[in-house]
Amino acid sequence: MVSLTSVPPYADATPDTRASSGPAPGRRKRMPLREHLAELRTRLLLVAGGLVVGAVVGWLLYDPLLVLLTRPLHLAAATQHKDIALNFTALGSPLDTRIKVSLFLAVMVTCPWWLYQVWAFVTPGLTRREKRHAYGFLGAAVPLFLGGAGLSWWVLPHAVDIFASFVPAGSSQYVNAQEYLSFVMRLVLAFGVAFVAPVLLVALNLAGIVRHETLARGWRWAVLLAFVFAAVMTPTPDALTMVLVAAPICALYFGALGVAVWHDRRADRRTAPAAA
C-alpha cells in the first residue's frame, strides 16, 4: 500500500520571502537614529581635522600670503605716488589677522575635503537619480565658485586703485589690516556665490519649485542685478570692467534657463500620456 503524506501539494511552490526581502531598488535600508548620529559625529570630526590641517598650513604660509594680499596696496601706492600701507591698530591685531587669514585659507583649500564628507553623509539616503543630480551640482558648483573667486582677485587691484585715488595729494593712507582683509574675503565670497547662484536656480527647477517660465519672465531683472552687482563690486570709471564682470553672470543665468527649459519640456512629455 502506498502511504500518502500530509504535506500540502503547493507548500514549496510559493516560498515566503517576507523575511528575506531587501529594500526596494534604488533605496537604502533605514538606519537607526543612533547610527545616524554616530556617522554625523565621525564626519564632523573629519571635517574639523581637515580644517585644522589647513589652518596649520595657512599659519606657516602666512608671510608670503600676506605679501600677496597686500600687493594691490603696493601697486596703488606705486602708480599714484602716494604713501599707502597696511596698519595694525591694536596690540593683538597682528595675531588676530594671522588667525583669520589661516582659517580663511583652511576653508578655501580644504573645500574638496569637507564637501566630500558632506557628500559621504548624505549620499546613502539618496536614490540613484538623486545621486546623479548631486554629482552634477557638485561638479558645476565647485569650478564656478573657484572661477568667481579668481575673477574677484582680478577685480581687487582695480578696486583698491580707485579707492586710493580719493586720497588727497600729500596725504598718507594707513589701511586697517582687519578691515582690509575682511574686504578681500567678502569680495571673494561675493563673487563665488554670484557664480554659484545659477546652479541653485537649476536645483530649484529640478525640485519642481521654479519653472522655466518664471526664469524667462525675470531675465531682465537678472541682467539688471548682475550689472548692479558688477557696478558695486568694481567701482571703476570705465564701463568695460563692469561689463567683463557682469557678462559671465548673465551667461550663467541664461545657461540655467536653458537647462530649466530642457528639464520642464522633458517632464511635460513624460507626464502627458499619464494625463491623457
UniProtKB/Swiss-Prot annotation:
InterPro entries per UniProt: TatC
Sorted UniProt keywords: Cell membrane, Membrane, Protein transport, Translocation, Transmembrane, Transmembrane helix, Transport
Topology in membrane: Multi-pass membrane protein
UniProt entry tagged with the keyword Membrane: yes
Positions of the UniProt region annotated as Disordered: 1-29
One GO BP: protein transport by the Tat complex
Residues annotated as transmembrane: 49-69, 103-123, 136-156, 187-207, 221-241, 242-262
Location of this chain's protein in the cell: Cell membrane
Family: Belongs to the TatC family.
Subunit structure: The Tat system comprises two distinct complexes: a TatABC complex, containing multiple copies of TatA, TatB and TatC subunits, and a separate TatA complex, containing only TatA subunits. Substrates initially bind to the TatABC complex, which probably triggers association of the separate TatA complex to form the active translocon.
Protein name: Sec-independent protein translocase protein TatC
Originating species: Xylanimonas cellulosilytica (strain DSM 15894 / JCM 12276 / CECT 5975 / KCTC 9989 / LMG 20990 / NBRC 107835 / XIL07)
Organism placement in taxonomy: Bacteria, Bacillati, Actinomycetota, Actinomycetes, Micrococcales
Gene: tatC
